[in-house]
Amino acid sequence: MYIEKIQSPADLKQLDLEALKVVAEETRTAVLNRVSKHGGHVGPNLGFVEATVALHYVFNAPEDKFVFDVSHQCYPHKVLTGRASGFLGDVDDMNAISGYSSPAESPVYDNFEVGHTSTSVSLATGLQKARDIKGTSENIIAIIGDGSLSGGEAFEGLDEASELGTGIIIVVNDNEMSIAENHGGIYKNLRALRESNGECQHNWFKAWGFEYKYLEEGNDLQKLIEVFQSVKDTDKPTVVHIHTEKGHGFQPAIDNKEAWHWGAPFNVEDGSRSSNSANSAESYEELYSNWMLREMKNDPTLIAVTAGTPAAAGFSPDKRKEAGKQHIDMGIAEEQACAMASGMAKGGLRPVWTVYSTFIQRTYDQIAQDLCINSNPAVINVVWGGAGTMNDITHICLFDIPMLCSIPGLIYLAPTTCEEYFAMLRWAIIQDKKPIAIRVPSNGVVHTTETVDTEYSYESRYKVMHKGSEVAIIAAGSFYQKGENVARLLSEQGIDATLINPRYLNAVDAGTLEDLKASHRLVVTLEDGSKDGGFGERIASYYSTSDMKVLVGGIKKDLYDRFDLQQLLSDNRLLDEQIVEDVLKIIR
């Protein structure tokens, strides 16, 4: 097997075309081996195998610099840069290799930690400028998918690359897909370029000042080598537009490109997944999308908004079709999603934008400026917030509470159960005074038989679930059940702790906190996120001039990567027994 012996791209240069074709097939098999056992991005990587072999054959990494956008197509690159063991070995070997471009893993061949989209051209222009200032001559190659071109930073990067005017090569990997189908006017031009074999006179890239090459056969190794050789060492900004097939070489991924963008482990022979990995349990994605579709039938102003990730809202292709004009996806463009939601709310619609926690930071300014300053009553549905969701350094979901709670004019709600979530969602949609964000629970779908409130205040109003004394536990959102566990363990120690569901993350309920002073010595706060700048620190600040002691439970601010959840909780003293130990040390 060639790839077991390849330690660097230089080894490829000793091979003829037929051997390179074997390398490509071995690389595809290795990628399939990894994703079938470990999970990961399937379709994007399979479609970029031949292009990766050709790039490394033609160019001279690490002297020539590759910048992968979003990293969804970087697995073949890893196989060919000395990391094949992470694709051929056992699961432990695979765990040692990140699913994203990572200089921490390979400082020689991976130039940036990348996991969010539309950044490659901008990053590459920085390398371009550094090269020009230093007077060196390496090739700078940015690799970006057509889906990533819907993001505003991609436009900014292309604009700057053209302005710099020196050699940079931008490989547009056009597989006619984002995670789902593409949305945006640019895709009409990409389609026209594909249909005309690159000859369409209305060429978006040429209008921006780029030299332009088109290759229809984007999975043909020989033609890829030829087109890359034709632009090597260029002194002009150049786009190489290649038409690839997402999922190439694996029929299930070809037949259902959206479902196979990313996947849990599967049977590589037929693409089937076990019942466990298929996740037959209830999910908020499914519950939310079904609820929205029912509500849409009675309210034509209700709009489901997504930004390139309709699965985050449970809007499958069939559900998107059913929703029709009442679902809008604007591609991977969170800034546009937020600002457009604000505009829709201003115009009398009821938009609900669903966004992964990790992508909130991509649109902080629009939330603050375009939404909150204008007090437009759009709803932000924040999903997968917390430590138990995504664990790659580029996708940490721990910072949405500090970010959103720092913005004046935004109410951030944290439901603890399914029933409470939908009550909050209905109120947030109906009210017309303020933007409301809701942190969807990330600890599974928990039901309650207790009556939940249907009306909420614009001022923070905590809910005392059990009134005790000495110790008060204020447990927010997904950590409410942890609060229940801690209260139960404390009761075994003879401590009848008060248990509070705060519901509001953005501001303290001064009335409730004042009431606690009479019969409590310690307040424990629990939140599933970064405690630095978070919910608990606001409560600690409130009590800072009093005798009340506050134990803030959350996760220390850091850039964690591929962490084990239980270990992370243990390291931050967030296991139930650890919290009880810390409480007892303080009060006894």
Model-derived features: where do they sit?
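Glycine-rich ThDP/TPP pyrophosphate-binding loop and its adjacent helix/strand module
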Residues: 110-266, 272-277, 285-288, 410-520
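Non-catalytic terminal/interface segments that mediate subunit docking, oligomerization
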Residues: 64, 250-361, 366-376, 475-477
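Cofactor-/ligand-binding subdomain signature composed of acidic, glycine-rich
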Residues: 1-34, 252-268
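Cofactor-binding active-site loop characterized by glycine-rich and histidine/acidic residues
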Residues: 41-164, 302, 307, 316-317
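Acidic, glycine-rich active-site loops and adjacent beta-strand->loop/helix elements
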Residues: 70-75, 144-151, 172-178, 218-219, ...
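A glycine-rich helix N-cap at a beta->alpha junction
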Residues: 87-97, 163-177, 372-384
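Peripheral docking tails and interdomain loops at the edges
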Residues: 265-276, 389-391, 411, 530, ...
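Glycine/charged-rich beta-loop-alpha catalytic/anionic-binding loops adjacent to active sites
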Residues: 29-36, 96-113, 135-141, 316-331, ...
